[in-house]
């Protein structure tokens, strides 16, 4: 047998060269191996088995005057005689007789060899060797530019520098402080996300240069998983690498030998492919199983005409067709390579995409062989080119700014700015800084990070050190994120608030925060072409429960509908823009809270009545005048909170009585004049706000509200309070200020749980001493004119002043 490994040297190359082998070269290499196996297999059969087997022909040449007996003998020699009829008395005996040629083994071998050389077509004889030779030529052509001294030296030098650039600690560490790493592109860049953080910093690696290394050799490292700082030795190595890249660029950009070499070897392969297809297609039919052999060796063998069998004809025929298929695929691949070589401008390489990704504009474009090698590397993995771009960029100023920022904002100084936000989380607000200090990620107790008006923010991998971080606020910030940081936020971030003015300030990575529970968006989502900011699908936010949009949309965005199945609370603050299309609300079957604020609604949307799980509805600051549709709320059995405040409602329909499950009701800031007694049939109400209306009279039926704890009638025209109000023994807050009241009933002493009382702005001349019976009422909870407070007995005043 012929071992295939013996031919490995024809295609063997350094493993590092694989980065310059695009997919088509790898594919043709595999095709070459397959064709090589066909050739080796055919050659092995040629060596191991008989090539041809011949037998002499007994038929004499035909003559014009042949006798009938000669013809009969010829027929007899080719036609077997019928067996004799057996005698019925004797047993049947058959004697097997062959045709005797009186030839010995040596003569047969001689005949076989002569017929093989003289009669067998050359294509059938040399087919496996042709396959082997053609394949070796293909393999040599594919790898010639790796072997030729003029090109291999440049390739080896480039691969050496490329590997050092890719693995340089500076590439990973220093760049994370200067630029923001782009969140990984869709698509797809999962191989990059599986790499170490060294690889992940690829796009933003474009931000450093040798001057950065020279001036700041010991910069704090963002990725603490590898090391704490960039030491002096690593800085010197990176500095030397910058110099190598500069010199290599000057040297390689001068010529285009690599491009010319690759084009020529590809053209040669295409020409060879056409030749192989042409002659193989024409000669494949010459591979025949039966071969007639006429050689003048009668004086040595006694025969001149022979009938031969080419033993491997059938197999060679199949192998030839298989070989033609492989060569065809190989040739088509080479044609595609030529198309790629001539269609693409491979002598120029633009880093425009990297510049856009990183926001660094000083990465220069390259040309000639340098550009060609970068194009080839992009076919292997574009990440190499992006990381290599680091050492073509000048960003020492940005590096210095980052260092100064870290020195200015020490961890102790940042801790002094910590405060508790509205969500009761420990928050660090940073406003109008030149960047994001790395020292922020040393404050491990941080729960909420608020960034305002900070451009080109980079969230590095070290955000993973903030184990308690659950909330992130980005107000007018253009933010990029390290992939490792994105992975951390996907697992830990619960609340995200984004205030944006344009698309750049709306982070694209937020759509992948699978554990995000609350999302607050503030910004214009208009369909103006000049400022077209749209939401992408939120379907990946599987845990999203609360969504708040403060914008100017005319309909509910489709992105919101994508999370309708698990959304529990939705708030739309529309800044006065009319919200007209609300049919998508019907899809939010699990919605429990809905706020439609300042949406210019004139009627209560009918789609709301389909939300059977709804518990709270807020229609603040709309243009509601009539609420007759309120009767449909009776189907919403779980509705407990209804806020129709800041509208233009003039009356409350009697259908309100059917909303027996209501516990909180707000009609403040409307134009209501008459308070219907039916309202108080909603006897579960605990919170009732009727402030800032034109109400003059409170029906005595208010005493039915035995669960009432909060009642506000502030800024109305009420002249007296019914005594039944004081039957609401659970009342804790009573606001009756800015009315026309002149007397406060002594029965107010029955409200033992009263802790807040506002009576300021009325016509009282004296306060009843029974206020002393309200033990929970203190001076801080009593809103009244100082002079009126002095009308209380001294012991009552002292009691209220006592904490």
From Swiss-Prot:
Residues 191-209 have a biased composition (Polar residues). Disulfide bonds join 54-308, 115-293. It is found in: Cell membrane; Endoplasmic reticulum membrane. Glycans are attached at residues 64, 70. It catalyses: chloride(in) = chloride(out); iodide(out) = iodide(in); taurine(out) = taurine(in); 2',3'-cGAMP(out) = 2',3'-cGAMP(in). It is linked to Telangiectasia, impaired intellectual development, microcephaly, metaphyseal dysplasia, eye abnormalities, and short stature: An autosomal dominant, pleiotropic disorder characterized by variable features that include telangiectasia, gastrointestinal vascular dysplasia, intellectual disability, skeletal dysplasia with fragile bones, short stature, and eye abnormalities. Patients exhibit striking cutis marmorata in infancy. This is Volume-regulated anion channel subunit LRRC8C.
